[in-house]
């Protein structure tokens, strides 16, 4: 897979984003992402040994339906994704946590920073989750933890999130976490052969 694919995966559609390598405080944080713990979850950096767990949900077309990447057809695609994430860690770039279900130590999804604007101290959070764990409040739990980290550790001023308007469940997660719906961007993203509207928070 090309770097262009993974840039699209991260949602790099903004005019001002993180440079290839972030220096200083932000780079240090992203190079050594702090583990976040919630009642049911551990949010930790991903590892190559997570490959089978990640492939298990990334191969699901329903999981991929409303995100910017296509369902993985082979485990090699998942390995390429993880190598990309590990490179982001090494470079101190905004990246993703693995969402670990404490009960089984299984990686069931990812959540993290799509980009970070150091001048305006703003970021966007994106996520994906195994279908086996939908409708259980898990993503709300994870998103609350990452929002706290964004404000308390990264000292950011603004945290954004956006989703396909055809996926209202994701909007409900944002609202439960105290985010405010700011509007709808028409034809904002070209994804899977069509332009889609997105709600922004």
What is the predicted function of each stretch?
Residues 70-71, 85, 157, 168:
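Hydrophobic alpha-helical elements and their junctions with loops/disorder across both membrane
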